[in-house]
Amino acid sequence: MFLERISKVQNLMRSHNIDALLLSTGADLPYFIGYEAMPLERLTMLVIRDEGQPMLVIPQLERARVIERPTIFDICEWGETEDPIEIVATALTGSVRVAIGDTTWTRFTIELLKRMPNIDLSRANPITSQLRSIKSAEELDRLQLAANAVDKIAHRLQNGQIELIGKTEKQVSEELGRQIIEEGHNKEIGRAHV
């Protein structure tokens, strides 16, 4: 699934004359490699060139959370004394047109532009959304499973099987969340990869 998505996005990049795609926090990173970056002040970024294998630039402290997928992406972990922006800039050598994820922290974008003032920077969303908006049969099946689970809970809620009286909004939310998990729903099935 991830390899197919990478291949499709590289084809789209070539058709849009984009040399490289940079993805950080947000929904794109899990969609393409199955990993959701922690919203830290340390840079985690997937560098996808229009050809070749992508590279995930990640802080050492976050490295243990990554599921290795060596046929899909390389991992470049950086330590406290290393400059991750320089690692990304080096990976972009020769790139002119670069698309960056909408949820990338501004400070990382500014630092990258300081090092590479001649790149033509654009938003990645026009490319990534083309892929993310069209669901495969597997994705549709997973969405249907998630919807069925939530429908069961909604039915219990409508029939008074979930206690609401005397509960705070937070308590009701926690109970609904607990029941969603009990029904087999999880972030991976629901949001992160679909």
Where are these regions (language model features)?
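Short acidic-hydrophobic, aromatic-tinged amphipathic segments that line or gate anion-handling sites
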Residues: 74-84
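Terminal domain-start leader segments
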Residues: 1-53, 93
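Conserved acidic residues
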Residues: 19, 73, 96
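Conserved small/polar residues in nucleotide/adenosyl-binding loops
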Residues: 192-194
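Short, polar loop motifs at secondary-structure junctions
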Residues: 58-65, 103-108
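Flexible, acidic/His-enriched mid-domain "rim/lid" segments that flank
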Residues: 3, 53, 83-188
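Short, hydrophobic beta-strand segments that form beta-sheet elements in well-ordered domains
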Residues: 21-23, 54-59, 98-100
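Short, basic/glycine-rich phosphate-binding loops at helix/coil junctions
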Residues: 64-71, 154
